[in-house]
Swiss-Prot record:
Protein name: Fructose-1,6-bisphosphatase class 3
Gene Ontology MF terms in the entry: fructose 1,6-bisphosphate 1-phosphatase activity
Reactions performed catalytically: beta-D-fructose 1,6-bisphosphate + H2O = beta-D-fructose 6-phosphate + phosphate
Enzyme class: hydrolase
Species: Clostridium botulinum (strain Hall / ATCC 3502 / NCTC 13319 / Type A)
GO BP terms: gluconeogenesis
InterPro entries reported for this sequence: FBPtase_class3, Metallo-depent_PP-like
Pfam families assigned: FBPase_2
Entry's family note: Belongs to the FBPase class 3 family.
UniProt EC number: 3.1.3.11
Keywords: Carbohydrate metabolism, Hydrolase, Manganese
Cofactor needs: Mn(2+)
Length: 668
């Protein structure tokens, strides 16, 4: 560390106004010096553990468990601390207790014969484990993570060595008192939650919290309580964000997908969206239509025939409305270059055919009661009224708006963090592997500048309420991010929703991926992207989601010699037969990178009652001989800047450029 001297006085004088503001926080040489010492000490602590999860798709049970077990980190800590001194069944029970303390305690109280003895043994084990997981943090940081009820006691226990003779009696008496006053259960719950919190320093969610699963709102509610989180938006997130902003095409897509998978719990129970007007509309216009191609795809859902018929009619009704609303955007925004997706005007109702790319296809469904062949993209009066009601329902859902604001305040299209580049989908490329240029708002953009612009437009869609023109363009862009040909979130040439519903020919259903996916194994492509985002290619990784890794077919999630890692979480049950597993997560700790593959999760109930954990296997991707420290991280760089500023303040005090506060004034 080099302190400023007289040769640097001009720099100090240039920053004098800022330093005077800083002196309000550190009003003396003593306080500034103490802070420098504290910050320097933090730089030498081990780097905190980062946990990367992607593509949750609303599967809240699997996600909740993954969050609680930190992709096996807690289990590994138990192994490290207790080794062979505990039986495997005891380790498993201890892990389950930490994951689900309230529920597990209820079971133990019913089955344990000597509860006081069990409390004593368990408290010792939990305190020992908590001492280890808290050892890489400052006391101040640990203190902030402690529940107020037990903060003092936990801090005392964490910082005392129970095996020292002079402290053993003190240590034991605290534990015995906790049991004697009947607070053992509450203490176990508190310290288990502290372990869960401290075991992961930073959580990264790489997109697609929303989709077909039944509990996206439960997931976001849990994430909003997490101590340190960032989110890289996925295509399914962006369509919900667009819906919350009031984009009618996004609203139609969100409802259609929910009906397609018979998942109305998030819409109706989670967010209070009233779908009764849609049900009424569907029964009026599609009463005699069996809507065969719109029957919901269900997994583990018991629906009766009446429910299926109603959902099918609602599904078809909102799909036709969606195609009309999308057509309006395509016509309004020729720069999107999506004219080939205008299909309603290519329907010949009389012949029952579709003219697609100058080829005639037979439609498998020819009932279009709301389609005006002269103005196929116009909503009829009933449709317009319905769309207005649905839009009002989305805009006025307090919980939905709160959750979407959380996604905005904690999310981005991409993130650079500790030399890693995180994004959900892709960086749009040309066929030759070069960055694809896209024209938006009369600007030609590519790579980082494209993503930065799209990020800003996504925010304008939601926040520019007093600028209708900018808000409308932003909302249209939200829809484009969902399904546009150059969207970094979608990553395909087109979304063939219409063809899948109305054409039998499977060739028309194909969705061509962006060339990015062809080059994912190419180190040169990764190097190009690192340079574009101003990252060191030798020490960086791209961490990617979106496309499930087909492990059963031999696909490897480690691409480009370890430069690119695909961690599609595989939470979505529909993908698991294709992938063969329940996907991957990533851990980045002070020792290196660990990629963990997971088997499908049974249920939270089985995890609590039977101790069933997610079966996982871990691959060490990188291992460093010398542990990474805070010094080596982004937060370390920020701390170094703080030290630099405090050093300038010290010189300013010592040179008399700023006067120290009187000690008496500081105290009082």
């Amino acid at each position: 560390m080099t302190l400023y001297d007289e040769n640097n006085l001009h720099i100090i004088k240039d920053n004098l106004r800022y330093l005077k503001l800083l002196s309000k926080q550190y009003p003396s040489i003593s306080s500034a010096s103490s802070e420098i010492i504290n910050l320097q000490a933090i730089l030498n602590l081990p780097k905190g553990t980062e946990h990367f999860i992607s593509d949750v798709h609303g599967e809240y049970e699997s996600f909740t468990h993954m969050l609680k077990n930190a992709s096996g980190v807690i289990k590994r800590k138990i192994d490290d601390v207790f080794g062979t001194s505990l039986r495997e069944c005891d380790k498993k029970n201890l892990a389950t207790l930490i994951y689900y303390p309230e529920q597990k305690l209820d079971l133990i109280k019913k089955s344990e014969k000597n509860l006081e003895d069990w409390y004593k043994i368990t408290l010792y084990r939990l305190i020992r484990l908590c001492q280890i997981v808290s050892s890489k943090y400052t006391r101040s940081k640990v203190r902030k993570s402690l529940p107020s009820d037990f903060a003092y006691i936990i801090e005392e226990l964490l910082n005392e060595q129970g095996d020292r003779v002079d402290k053993q009696e003190y240590y034991n008496s605290i534990i015995e008192t906790i049991i004697d006053i009947d607070r053992a259960s509450e203490f176990i719950i508190a310290i288990s939650n502290v372990i869960q919190r401290l075991v992961v320093d930073k959580l990264h969610i790489i997109g697609d919290i929303y989709d077909r699963g039944p509990g996206a709102e439960i997931i976001i509610e849990a994430l909003s309580k997490h101590h340190s989180i960032d989110i890289q938006w996925g295509n399914h997130d962006i369509v919900w964000m667009g819906a919350a902003a009031g984009c009618e095409a996004c609203i139609a897509n969100v409802i259609r997908i929910s009906l397609r998978y018979a998942n109305l719990s998030t819409l109706e129970d989670g967010y209070g969206i009233n779908l009764l007007p849609l049900a009424t509309f569907a029964m009026d216009f599609y009463k005699e239509d069996n809507c065969e191609n719109f029957k919901p795809r269900t997994i583990d859902k018991n629906l009766n025939e009446t429910d299926i018929k109603l959902l099918s009619k609602m599904h078809k009704a909102i799909s036709i409305i969606q195609f009309k609303l999308e057509g309006k955007i395509i016509k309004r925004r020729p720069e999107f270059k999506m004219g080939e997706r205008l299909l309603l005007d290519k329907i010949n109702i009389k012949e029952g055919t579709l003219n697609l790319n100058e080829k005639i296809y037979k439609l498998i469904d020819t009932n279009f009661p709301t389609l005006d062949k002269e103005n196929p993209y116009e909503l009829n009066e009933r449709e317009r009224d319905l769309v207005e009601k649905l839009t009002n329902s989305f805009i006025n859902s307090e919980k939905l708006q709160r959750h979407i604001k959380f996604l905005y305040s904690n999310g981005n299209l991409y993130l650079k963090y500790n030399s890693n580049l995180l994004y959900h989908g892709c960086i749009p490329l040309n066929e030759d592997g070069s960055l694809k240029e896209v024209t938006l708002c009369k600007e030609t953009l590519k790579g980082k500048s494209l993503l930065d612009k799209l990020d800003r437009l996504a925010r304008e869609a939601y926040f520019f309420k007093k600028d209708p023109e900018s808000k409308l363009y932003g909302m249209d862009m939200m829809w484009y991010l969902w399904c546009g040909s150059n969207s970094p979130l979608f990553g395909k040439k087109k979304m063939t929703t219409f063809e899948r519903y109305f054409l039998d020919d499977k060739n028309t259903h194909k969705e061509q991926k962006n060339p990015y996916y062809k080059y994912r194994n190419d180190e040169k492509m990764c190097t190009m992207i690192f340079e574009e985002f101003e990252l060191d290619a030798d020490n960086s990784h791209i961490i990617n989601g979106h496309i499930p890794v087909k492990t059963k077919e031999g696909e490897n999630p480690i691409k480009a010699n370890g430069k690119l890692l695909v961690i599609d979480g595989g939470f979505c049950k529909a993908y698991q037969p294709q992938t063969g597993i329940a996907g991957y997560t990533l851990i980045y700790n002070s020792y290196g990178l660990l990629l963990t593959s997971h088997e499908p999760f049974s249920s939270i109930h089985k995890a609590i009652v039977e101790g069933n954990d997610i079966l996982s296997s871990t691959t060490i991707l990188e291992h460093v001989s010398s542990r990474k420290r805070v010094l080596d991280t982004d937060s370390g760089e920020e701390i170094k800047k703080q030290i630099h500023d405090l050093e300038m303040l010290l010189v300013a005090y010592r040179k008399g450029l700023i006067k120290e506060e009187n000690e008496a004034n500081i105290r009082f």
